């Protein structure tokens, strides 16, 4: 089979399954409203959970950072791209989350791949929740380490896998809040089994940081767990982009030597780091508390109104509120009907989620108003979902 035949076959298979991914050009895609051409929609597909992407102080911080540093870092942090702005943000994150060190990465995907690739060898074992993010599972599958996956949030199966003989070290991998189901990992129970086995724990808290826990410190603080490796990302609750790995001093120094995504990537623009420091100030302050409280109220408003919907909602208490509809074409059709009614919703289909669980991934943000939630519920009820 030629290269072109291989590509054509793969695309035809996706089209036949109503699983072909496409992108839409939007004029404005973050915040309460999404604009496509001349049409405006209430946006229920954004990960901007606290509504910070449009925050005036954070926007100004980025502008001021660009005026001071320019628009790019100019190189890897190991060469010339590690500025005072990067150092300040790392220091603030480490102090906020109670770790000796924080290391910045250009994305959560890069951070997860770097950590697993740098740490694990052929005698090691990675034990990962089967619903962990693609960045984690891909890195684990590419690693020379043995990969074993446990049933979603099944602590007993995790413990059984950790108990199996291993010539090297073991790394348990999970998320704080899962991106597709919106549910939380039982981190305290997981951490107990990891400690008992003498393993290490990696928690990706992309969807929990800034949104949950005291002063937004995330899922681990909320459940009183301190993993050896905590990955936080900035494209959700922070409203920006990028990521950081929180760890010990020795592990940070190790990553500075062996984490290839850190060493060989141009570091994030310094202006972005300035904006992230401004976002952190909002998140950990009184305004952050107010936004989290507002978001929690909207989540409960939605769940109360969605209880009577025919589609299956999960037990999620997070900003991610999936409506499981099952069939790919049905999910696509429902998403289109909602858009026709002014609600921008995205259908999520396999292979992103398991077969037979196509869904509308509804995301709520602190930028929404109660009337937005009421309108969404009204449209869902009208659509028979």
From Swiss-Prot:
Catalytic activity, reaction form: 6-carboxyhexanoyl-[ACP] + L-alanine + H(+) = (8S)-8-amino-7-oxononanoate + holo-[ACP] + CO2
Keyword annotations of the record:
Biotin biosynthesis, Pyridoxal phosphate, Transferase
Q: Which cofactor does it need?
A: pyridoxal 5'-phosphate
Pathway given for this chain reads: Cofactor biosynthesis; biotin biosynthesis
> Which molecular function terms from Gene Ontology are attached?
8-amino-7-oxononanoate synthase activity; pyridoxal phosphate binding
Task: Give the GO biological process terms.
Answer: biotin biosynthetic process
Annotated positions binding pyridoxal 5'-phosphate: 108-109, 179, 207, 233
Which Cys-Cys disulphide bridges does the record give? none
Pfam families referenced in this protein's UniProt entry, alphabetically: Aminotran_1_2
Top-level taxonomic group: Bacteria
Q: Which enzyme type, at the first EC level?
A: transferase
- Positions binding substrate in this chain are 21, 133, 352
Q: Identify residues that carry N6-(pyridoxal phosphate)lysine.
A: 236
User: What Enzyme Commission number(s) does the record list for this chain?
Assistant: 2.3.1.47
Q: How does it assemble?
A: Homodimer.
Q: Which family does it belong to?
A: Belongs to the class-II pyridoxal-phosphate-dependent aminotransferase family. BioF subfamily.
What this chain does, per the entry, is described as: Catalyzes the decarboxylative condensation of pimeloyl-[acyl-carrier protein] and L-alanine to produce 8-amino-7-oxononanoate (AON), [acyl-carrier protein], and carbon dioxide.
Q: Which HAMAP family match?
A: BioF_aminotrans_2
Listed NCBIfam families:
bioF
Q: From the Swiss-Prot or TrEMBL record, give the protein name.
A: 8-amino-7-oxononanoate synthase
State the organism of origin: Pseudescherichia vulneris
Q: What high-level taxonomic lineage is stated for the organism?
A: Bacteria, Pseudomonadati, Pseudomonadota, Gammaproteobacteria, Enterobacterales
């Amino acid at each position: 089979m030629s290269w072109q035949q291989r590509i054509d076959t793969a695309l035809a298979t996706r089209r036949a399954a109503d699983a072909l991914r496409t992108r839409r050009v939007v004029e404005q895609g973050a915040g309460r409203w999404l604009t496509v051409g001349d049409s405006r929609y209430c946006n229920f597909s954004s990960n901007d959970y606290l509504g910070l992407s449009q925050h005036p102080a954070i926007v100004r911080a980025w502008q001021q950072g660009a005026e001071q540093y320019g628009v790019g870092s100019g190189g890897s942090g190991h060469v010339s791209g590690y500025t005072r702005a990067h150092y300040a943000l790392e220091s603030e994150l480490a102090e906020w989350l109670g770790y000796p060190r924080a290391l910045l990465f250009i994305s959560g995907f890069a951070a997860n791949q770097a950590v697993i690739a740098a740490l694990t060898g052929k005698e090691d074992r990675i034990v990962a929740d089967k619903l962990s993010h693609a960045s984690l599972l891909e890195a684990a599958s590419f690693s020379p380490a043995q990969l074993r996956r446990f049933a979603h949030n099944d602590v007993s199966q995790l413990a059984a896998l950790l108990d199996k003989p291993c010539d090297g070290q073991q790394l348990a991998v999970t998320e704080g809040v899962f991106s597709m189901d919106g549910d939380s990992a039982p981190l305290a129970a997981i951490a107990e089994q990891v400690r008992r086995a003498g393993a290490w724990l990696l928690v990706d808290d992309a969807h929990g940081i800034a949104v949950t826990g005291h002063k937004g410190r995330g899922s681990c603080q909320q459940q009183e767990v301190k993993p050896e490796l905590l990955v936080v990302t900035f494209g959700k609750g922070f409203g920006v982009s990028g990521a950081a790995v929180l760890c010990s001093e020795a592990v940070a120094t190790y990553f500075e030597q062996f984490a290839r995504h850190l060493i060989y990537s141009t570091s994030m623009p310094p202006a972005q780091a300035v904006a992230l420091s401004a976002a952190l100030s909002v998140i950990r302050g009184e305004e952050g508390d107010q936004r989290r409280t507002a978001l929690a109220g909207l989540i409960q408003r939605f769940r109360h109104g969605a209880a009577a919907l025919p589609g299956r909602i999960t037990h999620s208490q997070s900003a991610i509120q999936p409506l499981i509809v099952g069939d790919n074409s049905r999910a696509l059709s429902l998403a289109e009907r909602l858009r026709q009614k002014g609600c921008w919703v995205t259908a999520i289909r396999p292979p992103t989620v398991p077969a037979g669980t196509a869904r509308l991934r509804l995301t709520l943000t602190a930028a929404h108003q109660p009337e937005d939630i009421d309108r969404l519920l009204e449209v869902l009820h009208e659509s028979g979902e």
